Amino acid sequence: MAVAGVAKRYAQAAFAVAKEHGQLDFWEQRLTDLEALARDSAVEEFIQNPAIPLEAKVQVIDRLFPGDENRYVRNLLVLLLERGRWHQLRDVVVAFRELLREHRGVIDVELVTAVPLEPSEVERLRRELAQRLSRPVELRTTVDPELLGGVVLKIGDEVFDASVRTQLTNLRRQLVGAAA
């Protein structure tokens, strides 16, 4: 999932700070917390409430992320607050994760199947893809019954469609073309 614009710039700045201070692993752990914070409707309501002063909001962030190790995470959140961009926190998290995967050489792969796969099958496919691509693979699976069978594999911008639906569509085109 590509994130553009302002959220990506915030993520790039946060990533640069985390990398400079050797905190990439720490930030990776904090991303889950930030994601939960961004999804929490009570937090959103509190942050968006104009009757609550900025200082009170900053104090809450200080309590949620205490200690010196959280300083840069806290700075990012306060900056988003001050600039009226809190609503972009989720996109910042997504963009940061993309940068982290890219930095670590991880390839994002989506596997779409007609039926759910067993976890052991998914893990076997992930290992095989990692071996063939000579890079670590983050494999996400989704189910689309309309495929009828087979798989669709999305690696970066490339799509490998070996679904029964596509094969039937191609066969139909060939038959119609031959009949014309």
Curated annotation (Swiss-Prot):
Disulfide bonds: none
One Pfam family, short name: OSCP
PROSITE patterns xref list: ATPASE_DELTA (PS00389)
Localisation per UniProt entry: Cell membrane
GO molecular function: proton-transporting ATP synthase activity, rotational mechanism
InterPro entries (UniProt xref): ATP_synth_OSCP/delta_N_sf, ATPase_OSCP/d_CS, ATPase_OSCP/dsu
Membrane topology according to the record: Peripheral membrane protein
Keyword tags: ATP synthesis, Cell membrane, CF(1), Hydrogen ion transport, Ion transport, Membrane, Transport
GO cellular component: plasma membrane; proton-transporting ATP synthase complex
Domain of life where this protein originates: Bacteria
Family note: Belongs to the ATPase delta chain family.
Subunit structure: F-type ATPases have 2 components, F(1) - the catalytic core - and F(0) - the membrane proton channel. F(1) has five subunits: alpha(3), beta(3), gamma(1), delta(1), epsilon(1). F(0) has three main subunits: a(1), b(2) and c(10-14). The alpha and beta chains form an alternating ring which encloses part of the gamma chain. F(1) is attached to F(0) by a central stalk formed by the gamma and epsilon chains, while a peripheral stalk is formed by the delta and b chains.
Function: F(1)F(0) ATP synthase produces ATP from ADP in the presence of a proton or sodium gradient. F-type ATPases consist of two structural domains, F(1) containing the extramembraneous catalytic core and F(0) containing the membrane proton channel, linked together by a central stalk and a peripheral stalk. During catalysis, ATP synthesis in the catalytic domain of F(1) is coupled via a rotary mechanism of the central stalk subunits to proton translocation.
Identification of the protein by name: ATP synthase subunit delta
The organism's taxonomic lineage, starting at the top: Bacteria, Pseudomonadati, Thermomicrobiota, Thermomicrobia, Thermomicrobiales
